[in-house]
Amino acid sequence: TERNAPPFGAGLGLKPWGVDPELQWAGARAHNRWIAEFCHEAPLRRIGLAIVPMLYDVEQAVREVEWAHDNGLQGILIPALMGDYDAYNHPKYYPVWRACEERGMVVHNHSGPAPDYDFKLPGAMGIFLVEFAWWTARPMWHLIFGGVFEEFPRLKYCLTEVSEFWVPSMLEMMDVRASVKHTSGKLGDFRSNLSMKPSEYFDRNCWLSASALFDEGSTTVRHDIGMQNIMWGTDFPHPEGSWPRTREKMLQYMKGIPEGELEQLLASNAVTCYGLDEAALRELAGQIGPEKSLFEANPS
């Protein structure tokens, strides 16, 4: 589905095996130079992410975060799959999280990564569709239970293109697992590094970018997730996204949603997440954005 007009897809940020780290870093830097130039052409409308294969070399990763910020990019994409490398709850990665927190660089994982499948086998695609969101989101609970958001309370993390209907049950499961029970003593201390519930770290530090897979399931659970944590996108120009029928998709899944919630989904949550220029974007939205009447349940 990589029908991108740009010359790069998301593949550089997915798997840390079967590749030469040096070549992956070279490809990532080529992408990052290009995306910085691309966003510079329309800095108000384009939010660029640097690909940072941080598993291989923490010092290199910090330098790339610094370069990306200095060149106008607003976040990084890291591998969702960690393979045999140290997982993201390892303190060795603290310099990367610190560099991102200090610069307001949002850390991202993008859908797609999963263990290698033999798609010639029966049901392989169905298995992938069930599992891909779990693999993509796996770094999130490493960051939560690993105390990364405790150590770096202003660090921002975003999951993109993973659907949202499954998130409330995952938040509930993390809270249950983190709760103190008389039966959990044998498991050792895995909570003293946390001052809040896992769901509270999610509420404060995490966002969901609902590009491509925003559907009725995601719409109905929006309050269970937290209205301030969800952003909507078109996934342009991929065929699984809303384009070229974005207006119709908006009508299908958003009609009747209260105006304040729509503003969060379509605008203010992204402004908060990425630290955008709200006044300038409101002026631009007045020129090219959808009319409010489009979403009214019973327009006059």
Give short role names for the model-derived ranges.
Residues T1-G146:
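Active-site gating/metal-coordination segments in enzymes
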Residues G123, M173-V176, T246-K249:
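Short secondary-structure boundary/capping segments
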Residues A36-C39, P43-A50, N193-N205, Q287:
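Mobile, glycine- and charge-enriched loop segments
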Residues T136-W141, K186-R191, A210-F214:
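A general structural motif
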Residues I47-A50, I76-I78, V107-N109, Y157-L159, ...:
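Hydrophobic faces of well-ordered beta-strands that scaffold small-molecule active sites
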Residues V107, S111-P115, F145-D203:
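Aromatic-lined glycan-binding groove of carbohydrate-active enzymes
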Residues N71-G75, E101-V106, A124-F128, F152-L155, ...:
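Glycine-enriched alpha-helix->loop->beta-strand junction motifs that scaffold or abut catalytic
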Residues A26, R33-E41, R63-E66, G146-G147, ...:
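Mid-to-C-terminal alpha-helical segments outside catalytic/metal-binding sites
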